[in-house]
Amino acid sequence: MGQKVCAHGFRVGPTLIKGWDSVLYAEKHYKTLFIQDLKIRDLINKGFNQAQVSRVLIERPSNKSIIININAKKPNIIIGRNGSEIDKIKKAIEKMTSLKEVYINIHEVRKFNIDAAIVAQTIALQLEKRVSFRKAMKTAIQASFKQGGQGIRVSCSGRLGGAEIARTEWYIEGRMPLHTLRADIDYSTAEAITTYGIIGVKVWIYKGEYTENKRYN
């Protein structure tokens, strides 16, 4: 079953190595807050796709405040000139949530070659620029090992190279223990919109086994 379940969701839990992307407590308003979280993520991911956002962690410590932590490869794009872009995001979120206390923290992802979300987005951007899918996949694999990755699997699906019939091609190097719960495996997907149609990209990156100090918040 290791190949049929999301590697991230499979490891989410208080005793496992992955944490939730939304931290809140709501008895009756869970549905409303959940939809708000989806809209906030959509606003950030689509509005700043050039920043290559890796993760958006939303915390609601009380009914009056919200804390948004954004991990991105290029945080300067999100910050904007003199913080102009952050102010726009804050105003949009204040209007969306009706909250006056909106806090946004932006973190730079330094080891972006072993971040599955950023790697998938990078491959998708290259495919949109008509770079060969094989070259894009192999380049990502080589870069991952240089930054400490112990295993990587990359998959591309669609009309690869403009072929008439859609197909899936993938490369794998190193270890990929999908069944091992203590294995720190990062997984993400991305879409490349090309003239031939949409090409789906999937990336799995194995970073080593779980240790107490490596656990995500």
UniProtKB/Swiss-Prot annotation:
Highest taxon above the source species: Bacteria
Disulfide bonds: none
Annotated KH type-2 domain residues: 40-110
Cross-referenced InterPro entries: KH_dom, KH_dom-like_a/b, KH_dom_type_2, KH_sf_prok-type, Ribosomal_S3_C_sf, Ribosomal_uS3_bac-typ, Ribosomal_uS3_C, Ribosomal_uS3_CS
Family: Belongs to the universal ribosomal protein uS3 family.
NCBIfam families reported in the protein's UniProt record: rpsC_bact (TIGR01009)
Subunit-structure text: Part of the 30S ribosomal subunit. Forms a tight complex with proteins S10 and S14.
Function (record text): Binds the lower part of the 30S subunit head. Binds mRNA in the 70S ribosome, positioning it for translation.
HAMAP family per record: Ribosomal_uS3_B (MF_01309_B)
Name of the protein this chain belongs to: Small ribosomal subunit protein uS3
Organism: Rickettsia felis (strain ATCC VR-1525 / URRWXCal2)
